[in-house]
Amino acid sequence: KALITRQIEDFCGLLHGAPLGTAHRSISRSLNFLSGEALQTALSTYRAQLYNPESPHYNEGLYSLILAWEESSMKVDSAQKVAAYLQRVRLQHNAVGRTAQDFLYHTSDTTGTVSRRLSHFSAPYTLLVLSVDSDKRNQQWAEALHRHKALYRLVQEKHLRPLVVYTGATRPDSTLRSLWSGATLGYDSAKLITAQRRYDLSHGSALYLLDAKKTVLLRNTSIPKIATYLHARDEE
């Protein structure tokens, strides 16, 4: 088991940069040779390496090849096939290059609590934070944003507008409100994000970068990656 895990981890490192067709054939060959517990170990390792945003090998395109293999393979049961299919469909939601799925959220203004839609959130770039209860990354992202002077300057200039939506019962305390000063704080009161699974929150809180038309530019990303991306766009 440990050997298979290590081999798959090393293999994932080699897959990056390979043409998609080559990667597809290589992944299929690696899985076709396995069965039983060894196969399940390989699949779980692929998931940990390719579908965990914290992994250096994170790549949803490659992970979708794993799901496609599960769907078509005779080595997995029907329940696993269905689960793979549903996950692959969800991967297509809010994918990079697609329009972010719209949702209703509640926020406060001078008149009290009001309903707003993501699609009506006006900004050249939107930093969308979907905050999950008990996940500390919401605060970590806010702190990282403050530390990154160039990126925080874009926030002050309203070129980049943070929209922080709380998807659970937790509400921001005074510390978070201070850290997200200048951001729009919203709440998933209609439960469209969680109940209808409009966004994948299986990893916990999620961070997206959207353009003015709400096209997804980056997802499951980080503050440094957003800064690098926007700097490159400005250089174009």
Locations of regions flagged by a protein language model:
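Non-catalytic, surface beta->alpha helical segment in thiol-disulfide oxidoreductase systems
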Residues: 203-206, 212-236
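A structural signal for short secondary-structure junctions
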Residues: 121-122, 155-158, 199-203
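Short active-site neighborhood of thiol/selenol oxidoreductases, capturing the structured segment around
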Residues: 114-148, 161-165
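Structural microenvironment flanking redox-active thiols in thiol-disulfide oxidoreductases
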Residues: 139-179, 190-195
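Oxidative protein folding and maturation machinery
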Residues: 1-113
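Short, internal strand/loop/helix patches
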Residues: 175-208, 212
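Active-site proximal loops enriched in glycine and acidic residues that flank catalytic Cys/His/Asp
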Residues: 129-133, 164-168, 187-189, 211, ...
